[in-house]
Amino acid sequence: MAGHSKWANIKHKKAAADAKRGKIWTRLIKEITVAAKLGGGDVDSNPRLRLSIDKAMDANMPKDNIQRAIQRGVGGMEGANYEEIRYEGYGLAGAAIIVDCLTDNRTRTVAEVRHAFSKHGGNMGTEGSVAFMFTHCGQFLYAPGTPEDKLMEAALEAGADDVVTNDDGSIEVTCPPNDFSAVKAALEAAGFKAEVADVVMKPQNEVSFAGDDAAKMQKLLDALENLDDVQEVFTNAVIED
């Protein structure tokens, strides 16, 4: 099954994340804290905590930092009380954007998100205005050249929903969100460690941008990503090289 070219977009996002490692750690600590607070400190019974710890370890976060975040979440240490908020909005040409936040000050966060949208040619929508354009799923992306048949066999055996080969040769595997950790472990045991693996809001359709519009759209996405309270930004925009 063929899909759109997205390897360049994934590489851009990964490079940007690597460039701001300290900020990534801050976001992951907040996520671990909230996951532990909501579901307890046992990773065997808390899939969200297991996922956030996996991401922290992939980002080379020291185990002491991870443990302190868990303790803070379950009440062993003082820490900020974060709440989860999702904002939805539009970029250029009506491109859909979802902004997931963890914040201890809702008023500050909504003002910053709204300012980023308006400054860069977008606008905020109401709750539910674009979320229906996305599917909540586990996503694994493999570089062009990965053996497709072997990966497909391993993925389907692991419990994946779909395996898609994109136009650029990269391969995308998706699975139900709750099965993410099990599928990830099974794929890695079979020798397939993904370049990017996460639980995401995957767009059902995509909008391509090139030239000046691509640059403007990227500025909007970067402005949202760089806000301290923002954890994740999802969009159906595809930025062409």
Swiss-Prot record:
UniProt keywords, alphabetically: Cytoplasm, DNA-binding, Transcription, Transcription regulation
Keyword Transcription regulation in annotation: yes
Gene3D superfamilies named among the record's database cross-references: 1.10.10.200, 3.30.70.980
Presence of the UniProt keyword Electron transport in the record: no
GO cellular component terms, semicolon-separated: cytosol
Any one GO molecular function term: DNA binding
Any GO BP annotation: regulation of DNA-templated transcription
Subcellular location: Cytoplasm
Highest taxon of source: Bacteria
Family: Belongs to the TACO1 family.
The protein, known as: Probable transcriptional regulatory protein H16_A0916
Organism whose genome encodes this protein: Cupriavidus necator (strain ATCC 17699 / DSM 428 / KCTC 22496 / NCIMB 10442 / H16 / Stanier 337) (Ralstonia eutropha)
